[in-house]
């Protein structure tokens, strides 16, 4: 088989080691490229290194990956790489941990603005291997890595007519550092929408439609945000600290809408097909927005997060709920 320019595709060998990133979103950006590699090299073993435990959850149950390793130690990765014919670093900031590898190493270059990060990784592996991309290749892949078949809200008291909106209130920094980071740096962190704005948004939506209920997610370090939201918004289902990435993916299938700022869970939602409303300040949705952009996705972009008005978000949310209604099957949630 020849490539479109008449050359033979690159021979990767029998075993390839892929090196991903340390953040959930950046690892999700790698998944279309991994699927592309497995599609074109079905007999090659692709093992993968994620740099920490939480971001590794992206790859749980991913059938394109044979073995998942978790380490950010350069010496361990250098030793591991000796067992592989090719090593491909899928995230440019992970290049430091692969710098000890002396041969058969390829790495995604620094990312540029104006092109989605997932597309840049995908374009790199397509060019590197010599295989042609199609539109079908532009899709995230999140595996069924959940240990249970039930929904994360299976035991919640949910009515037949409830409209469920999932919101993720934090970001990568609050997920790791919790309230100390939030209260010391909340005015400096450019990706965060103020918690008071989320609360105002929620209560405006409930006033617009009393059937609306909110499901909030996050890591255990973000429990302080959940308590504040739950206290101010009646009927909230608080799942903060209770879900893995595969469970979040499963949760999205039960939601009518997902709303958040630019964060890893936004990309989980993007992979799931749920109607999605993303809030962007200085970060560019062309780089890190929903992927690929669909009719049931809206990205609100302002110069700063503080410039995003809850009333504008309410209007966009109600439009998505009207345009993409969902019929919930309560069997999967538990009947009440």
Where are these regions (language model features)?
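Catalytic machinery of carbohydrate-active enzymes
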Residues: 1-336
């Amino acid at each position: 088989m020849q490539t479109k320019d008449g050359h033979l595709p690159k021979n990767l060998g029998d075993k390839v080691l892929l090196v991903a990133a340390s953040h959930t979103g950046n690892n999700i950006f790698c998944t279309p490229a991994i699927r592309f590699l497995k599609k074109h090299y079905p007999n090659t073993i692709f093992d993968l290194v994620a740099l920490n435990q939480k971001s590794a959850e992206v790859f749980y149950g991913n059938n394109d990956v044979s073995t998942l390793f978790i380490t950010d130690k350069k010496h361990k990765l250098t030793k591991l790489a000796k067992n592989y014919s090719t090593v491909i670093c899928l995230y440019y900031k992970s290049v430091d941990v692969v710098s000890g590898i002396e041969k058969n190493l390829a790495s995604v270059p620094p990312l540029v603005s104006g092109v989605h990060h997932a597309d840049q990784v995908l374009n790199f592996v397509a060019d590197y291997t010599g295989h042609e991309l199609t539109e079908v290749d532009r899709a995230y892949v999140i595996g069924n890595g959940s240990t249970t078949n039930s929904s994360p809200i299976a035991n919640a008291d949910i009515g037949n007519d409830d409209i469920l909106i999932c919101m993720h209130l934090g970001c990568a920094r609050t997920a790791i550092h919790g309230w100390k980071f939030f209260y010391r740096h909340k005015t400096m962190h450019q990706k965060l929408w103020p918690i008071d704005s989320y609360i105002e948004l929620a209560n405006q939506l409930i006033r617009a439609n009393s059937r609306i209920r909110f499901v909030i997610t996050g890591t255990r370090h973000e429990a302080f945000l959940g308590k504040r939201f739950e206290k101010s918004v009646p009927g909230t289902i608080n799942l903060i600290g209770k879900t893995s990435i595969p469970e979040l993916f499963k949760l999205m299938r039960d939601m009518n809408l997902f709303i958040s700022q630019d964060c890893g869970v936004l990309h989980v939602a993007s992979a799931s097909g749920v109607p999605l409303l993303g809030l962007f300040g200085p970060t560019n949705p062309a780089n890190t927005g929903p992927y690929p952009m669909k009719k049931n996705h809206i990205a609100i972009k302002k110069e700063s997060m503080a410039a995003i008005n809850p009333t504008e978000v309410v209007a966009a949310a109600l439009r998505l709920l009207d345009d993409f209604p969902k019929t919930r099957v309560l069997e999967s949630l538990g009947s009440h």
